[in-house]
């Protein structure tokens, strides 16, 4: 990805204390830095409304309570959602930056916003912000997540080569040993001939380990199995469960690792989760050293990109970038499954399905020349359908959860 005259790129960084501070500069004019401060009372109330609309549990809530609240809230009703995302746009997009971007659009140039959110803006669905009638921010620009300079410019970091026809290490809804319903299947049964099955068939010659016929719900995909495969792959494609903890490096990926595996997390019900620290520092006490990630990584799981909410924003996304990834797609909040939608969303039917199309869209984006532009294109299509029809399958509660870190 290059900052060409056809694609002017701006780096936008946010920091919060009692107020919200912005700094931005265009990559073709790095010395021209703009700084503004927005009073806290102008932004905290609408951010509180956003938190109340999202499926991430609030203090004292269970996961089911959070899902029921969110799936009966603003993101399930087009008019209420537009009111919320319009208020977010007015509160959060700096007027001066908007003017600069509009000037570029009038010249036929589509900007790229590389955005580094602050602690309190970590869950803002920037792509979905409603900036005008039938227009979201992603309508007029591409958006990606700008990793912290300490991650993207780390002297030991070496970005892995992108190999368009390279192997894809696909961990698709793995079986977690000893797991109850909280770590059960996120995709449900994948029927032969279904869109997900067709996706696996398309990747068949590149899938490792295994074949298209054995791509889903495997019980043998452990850290010791996939770690050596990732070093030579082009992509890591994970669909499953992520859980957060007290700090970012303890963010946990749930594979098929039993109690006999080694790592920094304690064994829970016969299963040892893989932490971000295991990826960065290595999971074998006898063989210290971090993993080697491929160029492109996708974590389709609950709040897999939620590390910005921590004081030290180093979690799974930063771990993947630090160990070789250039593009990492992850989620900002708890992702409702199809089963969750059918259970709690009043307008859902037994046939309501959202996650398979989402998985397929992320897969296609990560095989494209520009994952950021490709994922944003899919998000624009979903936004247009939501604006036109208001179907819950097109609600931003799923497509706006995703952001791609690029660095």
Give the ranges of each region predicted by the language model.
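Caspase-like cysteine protease fold
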Residues: 261-292, 334-407
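Non-catalytic, solvent-exposed interaction/assembly segments
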Residues: 1-114, 118-121
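Cysteine protease catalytic core and zymogen-processing segment of caspase-like enzymes
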Residues: 221-223, 243-326
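Boundary/activation segment at the start of structured domains
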Residues: 1-21, 30-31, 120-188, 393-401, ...
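Short hydrophobic alpha-helical runs that function as membrane-insertion/retention elements
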Residues: 327-331
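A domain-level signal for caspase-like cysteine endopeptidase catalytic cores
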Residues: 56-76, 117-121, 145-250
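Helix-enriched interaction subdomains in cytosolic or periplasmic regions
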Residues: 79-80, 109-151, 246-271
């Amino acid at each position: 990805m290059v900052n060409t005259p056809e694609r002017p790129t701006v780096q936008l960084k946010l920091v919060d204390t009692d107020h919200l501070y912005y700094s931005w500069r265009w990559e073709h004019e790095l010395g021209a830095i703009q700084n503004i401060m927005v009073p806290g009372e102008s932004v905290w109330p609408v951010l509180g409304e956003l938190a109340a609309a999202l499926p991430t549990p609030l203090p004292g809530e269970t996961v089911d309570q959070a899902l029921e609240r969110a799936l009966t809230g603003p993101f399930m009703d087009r008019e209420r959602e537009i009111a919320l995302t319009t208020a977010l746009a007015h509160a959060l997009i700096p007027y001066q930056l908007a003017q600069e971007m509009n000037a570029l659009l009038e010249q036929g140039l589509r900007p790229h916003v590389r955005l580094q959110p602050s602690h309190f803006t970590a869950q803002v669905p920037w792509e979905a912000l409603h900036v005008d009638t039938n227009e979201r921010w992603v309508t007029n620009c591409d958006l990606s997540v700008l990793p912290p300079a300490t991650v993207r410019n780390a002297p030991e970091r070496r970005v892995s080569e992108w190999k368009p026809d390279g192997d894809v290490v696909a961990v698709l809804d793995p079986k977690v040993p000893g797991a109850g319903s909280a770590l059960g299947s996120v995709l449900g049964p994948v029927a032969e001939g279904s869109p997900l099955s067709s996706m696996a068939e398309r990747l068949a010659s590149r899938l490792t380990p295994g074949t298209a016929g054995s791509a889903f719900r495997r019980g043998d995909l452990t850290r010791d199995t996939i770690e050596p495969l990732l070093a030579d792959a082009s992509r890591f494609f994970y669909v499953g469960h992520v859980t957060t903890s007290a700090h970012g490096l303890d963010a946990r990926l749930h594979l098929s690792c039993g109690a006999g595996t080694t790592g920094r997390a304690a064994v829970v019900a016969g299963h040892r989760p893989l932490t971000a620290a295991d990826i960065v520092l290595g999971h074998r006490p006898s063989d210290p050293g971090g993993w080697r990630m491929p160029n492109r990584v996708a974590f389709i799981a609950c709040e897999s990109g939620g590390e910005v909410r921590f004081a030290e924003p180093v979690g799974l996304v930063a771990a993947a970038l630090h160990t070789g990834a250039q593009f990492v797609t992850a989620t900002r909040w708890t992702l409702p499954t199809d089963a969750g939608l059918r259970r709690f969303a009043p307008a859902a039917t037994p046939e309501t399905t959202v996650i398979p199309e989402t998985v397929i869209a992320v897969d296609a984006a990560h095989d494209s020349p520009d994952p950021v532009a490709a994922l944003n294109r899919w998000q624009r299509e979903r936004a247009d359908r939501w604006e036109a029809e208001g179907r819950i399958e097109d609600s931003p509660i799923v497509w706006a959860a995703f952001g791609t870190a690029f660095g």
